Curated annotation (Swiss-Prot):
The keyword Zinc applies. This is Phosphoheptose isomerase. Keywords: Carbohydrate metabolism, Cytoplasm, Isomerase, Lipopolysaccharide biosynthesis, Metal-binding, Zinc. Pfam families: SIS_2 (PF13580). Substrate binds at residues 52-54, 65, 93-94, 119-121, 124, 172. The gene is gmhA. Binds 1 zinc ion per subunit. It comes from Photorhabdus laumondii subsp. laumondii (strain DSM 15139 / CIP 105565 / TT01).
Amino acid sequence: MYQDLIRSELNEAADTLAKFLSDDANIEAIQKAAVLLADSFKVGGKVLSCGNGGSHCDAMHFAEELTGRYRENRPGYPAIAISDVSHLSCVSNDFGYEFVFSRYIEAVGKEGDVLLGISTSGNSGNIIKAVEAARLKGMKVITLTGKDGGKMAGTADVEIRVPHFGYADRIQEIHIKVIHILIQLIEKEMVKA
């Protein structure tokens, strides 16, 4: 009944991954991001992650597997997804939704910390404001974007961009794989500490 649609969806996902994988710059960016994160942890820094919608779930997933567990038993790593509902609703109401992440960074971010900002379009105003706030705090910035990087292109220390111009879910599928690889590489880097 739906077998052709299922095959088509899986083939499109595989094609998106193959295109991403064929660009060595993507592989190098993932490695650079993992080392940057591990270096922050080694000196007492933390990572703050944020996104909207499905990207918000990815930001939470990233923090959960750093503080909890990925594949190996190891110490938890300092990671916070900016996802406290009382904070999000307070700042949205009092300042505007575009400030929900930047306000949190103003409060708890510090030099030596890292921001992971996730936006499939690269145009999310509240993620752009988060990047700006992180810069003012002296933090390093990693972004996961899609398409052409949008307004976030060129704003990060490391940008990992999925060059897909269709639906956002294809970009998110690569983002979650990148997140898992980042955690795996961080675990390897932290063993060296």
